[in-house]
Amino acid sequence: RTCLEGLRVLDLTSFIAGPFCPMLLADLGAEVVKIESAEGDPFRMAAFAFAGWNRGKRSLVLDLKTSAGRDVFLDLARHADAVVDNLRPGVLARLGLGTEALRAANPRLVHTSITGYGTDGPLAPLPGFDPSPPTTRSPTSYQTFGYADSCSMASPTPPGASAVNAATFSVV
């Protein structure tokens, strides 16, 4: 028996920071169902990384833009313990699947949303992938690509490691 056996998680994530959290839950025994559109997760282009970040998960194709897809998702949410997404703020609400709709379907459901810039404020609607946040609001944004005139403010130099993506799961 594992420590999270019996826990059911719906995974609406892609790329790195999003899938890492549900991956850890699956590693600890939770049943994780990754929901993808018919086009699939764009991170599938990195096959080995995709397989690693999505190990231990079941996969289900749903078109959340249709009423049938939304109905199936809400039925799954009625029997789930958590939903994890890394969509831009407001995307699920526009689909009729925001936190209020999820809680109406299942009042004990935990909804975790991983965003690049939070849920409100001027940058909230923007997609954010590491190193986007560190290069827009940190000393990294002042680094240049080695130009002689360091005041030229050339394109930001991202950090070598994907620190934000790797650390996000510890906050979630």
Describe the predicted segments one by one.
Residues 144-149, 153-172:
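Short amphipathic, helix-prone segments within low-complexity/disordered or flexible regions
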